[in-house]
């Protein structure tokens, strides 16, 4: 695995952690809050964003306008049964969700969730590091690399891992600050 491949693989793990962070409520309306919602549509689970236009007319409201009005009830049900705690308002054409301000308890729950997502990202990075170091050790064992070259490569891999872990920690602290901001 080249250094570039290692960086690409690790940056994908960081991006996945960032996508997870984006699905956490912060007290302001955000369309990415609904990214994980799937709707039962003609017998198949379909992502909400494939069935409707999702907008934020103001900082406390999310508006969902289905492409097919027949899916309105299914979308409303999927939102109501999700773990987001939203109550959808259906006016026959558009579903509106009022995003209430977060309680202190809910903010703490979301901070824990963000920490969990960050830890998942770090574990993924460590797994990538382990695989890369195992390849380097195998190359050394096969005689393709000297002991010094192997140690240098392992140090480079560790430095890259540390940099990406710092990146996740930075994103986590930004998200926690955003969640805790009243």
UniProtKB/Swiss-Prot annotation:
The keyword Protein biosynthesis applies. One of its GO terms (biological process) is translational termination. GO terms for cellular component: cytoplasm. It is found in: Cytoplasm. Residues 136-160 are annotated as: Disordered. The keyword DNA-binding does not apply. Keywords: Cytoplasm, Protein biosynthesis. GO terms for molecular function: ribosomal large subunit binding. It comes from the Bacteria. Gene3D superfamilies: 3.30.1360.40, Ribosome-recycling factor (1.10.132.20). InterPro entries: Ribosome_recyc_fac (IPR002661), Ribosome_recyc_fac_dom (IPR023584), RRF_sf (IPR036191). Pfam families: RRF. Disulfide bonds: none annotated. HAMAP family: RRF (MF_00040). Belongs to the RRF family. Responsible for the release of ribosomes from messenger RNA at the termination of protein biosynthesis. May increase the efficiency of translation by recycling ribosomes from one round of translation to another. This is Ribosome-recycling factor. It comes from Prochlorococcus marinus (strain NATL1A).
